[in-house]
Amino acid sequence: MRTLWIMAVLLLGVEGSLVELWKMVFQETGKEAVKNYGLYGCNCGVGKRGKPVDATDRCCFVHRCCYKKVTGCDPKKDRYSYSWENKAIVCGEKNPCLKQVCECDKAVAICLRENLGTYNKNHRVTVKFLCKAPESC
């Protein structure tokens, strides 16, 4: 029950590309992004940093690094457009910055799908203080 409450709090005030990211993750993995990845490992979710605990967590680490390279827009708030064509994500954004955000989100969604075999339910709620020092991007 407590986990559901935490997830509900994380959803408050969500806007912009996070919604698109969550849709992409569901389309690629079949898993609800917030429930399955919102607190996963040491890198998935808001404010988490640390040495990745597995390949799934590394996807989130690489995604955060990708967002750090984005300039000219806010990756977490500004909305972009994409489509789902023949079971593939197609970033259709004309704005170069928003296209870059879309490509970052597409990459993490595909990475999570490719690493479904490393997904460990024991890492679904990892407490931040248990994480080791983060790597640099």
Curated annotation (Swiss-Prot):
Its main location: secreted. The keyword Thylakoid does not apply. This is Basic phospholipase A2 PeBP(R)-I/II. Pfam families: Phospholip_A2_1. GO terms for molecular function: calcium ion binding; calcium-dependent phospholipase A2 activity; phospholipid binding; toxin activity. It comes from Protobothrops elegans (Elegant pitviper). Keywords: Disulfide bond, Hydrolase, Myotoxin, Secreted, Signal, Toxin. The sequence shown is that of PeBP(R)-I. PeBP(R)-II differs at two positions. Negative results: does not show hemorrhagic activity. Residues 1-16 form the signal peptide. Expressed by the venom gland. SMART domains: PA2c. PROSITE patterns: PA2_ASP, PA2_HIS. It is an enzyme of class 3 (hydrolase).
